[in-house]
C-alpha cells in the first residue's frame, strides 16, 4: 500500500491469453521450503509455455525472513496469516495484509500459498483448500488441491484471517500447501513443491505441458482436532506426523523439570496426525498436536482402471491372466526367488507384465 512494502517478485506474462495465477511464499518468514520453491519456480518456468500470467512473490514477510523472526511480525509480534484482509492504518502486519489483499490478490484468477510447519513444528505434507466461499470457488479450490502430491487434504472452514481464506471469500479459488518444517528445507521438498505448482498450472491450462508423476492422491481429512498445551512444560511426543492413531491412545505427555506429569495428550478419535510440536518445550495455550479423521470416499479411479482393461479385451479376466503369466513374468519370477531370504518362508503371490509396466505382488510369510 502506497509503496511501503517492497517484495521480491517475478511476473511471467505469456504471449498467449489466459488466466492469472498468484503464488506466494514467506507469509511466515521461517517457512523455507515454499520460499526456495518460489525462487526456483521463477527461474525454471519457461515463459514461452505460459498462457496468461504467473505472479510469484518469493517472500511476503520480508522483515521477519531477513531477521529470522519466524512467523511473527518484527515490530508488532502479530501472525500475518491471522490478519487478512488487514487494515491500511493498523500495525505493520495489518498493513501488509491489507496491501496483499488489495494490491496482489485482485489481479489473480487463482491463488497458491506455500507454507511449512513453523520452526518448532513437524508435519506430514498436506494441502488445505478454501471451503468458505461460493460453491464454484470451493469446487475449483478442491480440484486444485487434488493435483497436489500429498497424502491428505483438508477443507478450511474459515473465510478470513488467512491469506488464501480471504482470497477465496472474494471469489478466487485458493489453496495452501504444507511441506517441511522445523526451520529447515531440503532439495527434495523444494522439488516436490515445484512439481505440485507446475502440475496445478498445467491442470488449469496456464502452463503448457504434461503433468508430472505423482505418488499420492490426497484423501480428505476432517474434524481437525488442534490440541493446545494447558501450561508451559516439556513435551514428549509418542508419535510422528503421518502416524495413524486410535481413539483413547496417548499421543504424548507434558512434564515438569523434575519429571512430574503435568498433562497427557489423548486421541479423541481414530485418525492421522497432521503436525505436532517438535521441540522439547511447549507453551501454555500453544500448539501441541493436530490430527483429524480420514474420510474414504468412493474412488472413481478403480472404475477407470477396470474400464481401461475391458476396452483392451472382450474377456478382461482371460486377458489379464495371460499377461500375468507371460514368459517374461516367469523369467522374473525365477530371478526374484533367488533373492528372497530362505529363513523367512516367503512366497510370491503374483508377478505380472503389462503394456508399459511390470508389477510384482510379493511376499507373504507362511
Model-derived segments and spans:
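Short acidic capping loops at alpha-helix termini that bridge into adjacent secondary structure
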Residues: 52, 344-345
Amino acid at each position: 500500500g502506497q509503496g511501503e512494502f517492497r517484495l521480491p517478485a517475478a511476473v511471467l506474462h505469456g504471449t498467449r491469453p489466459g488466466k492469472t495465477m498468484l503464488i506466494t511464499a514467506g507469509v511466515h518468514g521461517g517457512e523455507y521450503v515454499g520460499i526456495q520453491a518460489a525462487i526456483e519456480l521463477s527461474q525454471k518456468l519457461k515463459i514461452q509455455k505460459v498462457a496468461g500470467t504467473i505472479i510469484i512473490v518469493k517472500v511476503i514477510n520480508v522483515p521477519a525472513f531477513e531477521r529470522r523472526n519466524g512467523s511473527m511480525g518484527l515490530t508488532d509480534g502479530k501472525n500475518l496469516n491471522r490478519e487478512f484482509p488487514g487494515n491500511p492504518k493498523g500495525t505493520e502486519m495489518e498493513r501488509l495484509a491489507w496491501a496483499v489483499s488489495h494490491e496482489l490478490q485482485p489481479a489473480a484468477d487463482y491463488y497458491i500459498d506455500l507454507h511449512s510447519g513453523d520452526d518448532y513444528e513437524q508435519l506430514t505434507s498436506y494441502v488445505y483448500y478454501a471451503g468458505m466461499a461460493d460453491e464454484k470457488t470451493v469446487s475449483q479450490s478442491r480440484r486444485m488441491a487434488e493435483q497436489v502430491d500429498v497424502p491428505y487434504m483438508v477443507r478450511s472452514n474459515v473465510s478470513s484471517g488467512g491469506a488464501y481464506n480471504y482470497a477465496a471469500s472474494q471469489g478466487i479459488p485458493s489453496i495452501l500447501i504444507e511441506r517441511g518444517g522445523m526451520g529447515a528445507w531440503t532439495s527434495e521438498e523444494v522439488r516436490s513443491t515445484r512439481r505440485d505448482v507446475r502440475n496445478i498450472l498445467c491442470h488449469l491450462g496456464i502452463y503448457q505441458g504434461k503433468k508430472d508423476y505423482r505418488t499420492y492422491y490426497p484423501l480428505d481429512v476432517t474434524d481437525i482436532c488442534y490440541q493446545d498445551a494447558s501450561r508451559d512444560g516439556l513435551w514428549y511426543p509418542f508419535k510422528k506426523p503421518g502416524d495413524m492413531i486410535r481413539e483413547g491412545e496417548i499421543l504424548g505427555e507434558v512434564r515438569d523439570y523434575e519429571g512430574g506429569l503435568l498433562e497427557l495428550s489423548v486421541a479423541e478419535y481414530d485418525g492421522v496426525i497432521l503436525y505436532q510440536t517438535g521441540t522439547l518445550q511447549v507453551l501454555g495455550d500453544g500448539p501441541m498436536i493436530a490430527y483429524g479423521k480420514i474420510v474414504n470416499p468412493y474412488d472413481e479411479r478403480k472404475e477407470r482402471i477396470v474400464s481401461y482393461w475391458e476396452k483392451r479385451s472382450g474377456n478382461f479376466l482371460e486377458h489379464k491372466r495371460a499377461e500375468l503369466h507371460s514368459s517374461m513374468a516367469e523369467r522374473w519370477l525365477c530371478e526374484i526367488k533367488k533373492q528372497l531370504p530362505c529363513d523367512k518362508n516367503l512366497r510370491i503371490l503374483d508377478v505380472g507384465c503389462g503394456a508399459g509396466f511390470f508389477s510384482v505382488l510379493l511376499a507373504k510369510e507362511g
